[in-house]
């Protein structure tokens, strides 16, 4: 028994709809944007100095009460030095502005940490988390 001629058209139409939906699912945000990050320590933090290395980094932003100051260390390597200061102390929130959110996340290293009392702290236990 053969299928009616309209069933081929229905199958083709369903195939085109499924193919179109699959093409529309691109896997997430692309293009420029900001990756949010937080710095936490075992004690109340007032400031940290970070080294941030990555391709396509265009700037840094403080979030909440945090202020961000940055300088390019090596443009060829995409290496930046960032000072994050939160006078109230506690959770230090910041953003990294990038050219492409789909690119690999930057590598972040804590160089120096200080408490809200301006006393240097060991960077052991100070953790930086970036969103993907």
Residue ranges of each PLM-predicted region?
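Sec-dependent bacterial lipoprotein signal peptides
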Residues: 1-25
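Acidic, low-complexity intrinsically disordered segments
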Residues: 25-132
